[in-house]
């Protein structure tokens, strides 16, 4: 018998694979899905917490845009040493928001947290010392990504930090194929079947549109960030830091 939180969404053949959405079904299995699908996820979350120790400033806001179940939010709240900060988590899935609030409320912390249901493109970024986009930008229309990053840069205080984690594609088709196959093997090693890998890929192909690392770096520079660097990569999963 499987635990209720095991990801079995694509374990049976679907007559028609629907576009992936962060609905109630996904929310139930999200931690399992992420840990078995995203290499290095725990390292990224832990490092976001470490970065919050260094970059959060007194009397400022911290944003977790596309907060899902609040893993990055909780890591930052644990790491923050600055005074009088506030964390604002935003997600457009009502199911995620409901569960995220429960997760956040289950852990005590000195820094107040507000979780909002909303479109991150409509949220004002103000007086921010740290912003996190953890595998979120890839679900935004490509034509709207530059505007979002520019808005974040404008809302950050000098010395403020953006953490941008993204699945990437490579302009080199040979490298792209190698990285994709390594990732699929990672999922197989974590118990996903060929059917699950294929159906999940089909569900994501129209809603998760990846960019190359160079495109991400160019956008961040154009947005106004002075210092941009890749700090993590495993296969085609990456995380960058951008400092204003």
UniProtKB/Swiss-Prot annotation:
Source superkingdom: Bacteria
KW Oxidoreductase (keyword) present: no
Reaction(s) this enzyme catalyzes, per UniProt: prephenate + S-adenosyl-L-methionine = carboxy-S-adenosyl-L-methionine + 3-phenylpyruvate + H2O
Keywords in alphabetical order: S-adenosyl-L-methionine, Transferase
Coiled coil: none
Family the entry assigns: Belongs to the class I-like SAM-binding methyltransferase superfamily. Cx-SAM synthase family.
HAMAP family per the UniProt record, alphabetical: Cx_SAM_synthase
Role description: Catalyzes the conversion of S-adenosyl-L-methionine (SAM) to carboxy-S-adenosyl-L-methionine (Cx-SAM).
Subunit structure: Homodimer.
Name under which the protein is recorded: Carboxy-S-adenosyl-L-methionine synthase
Gene: cmoA
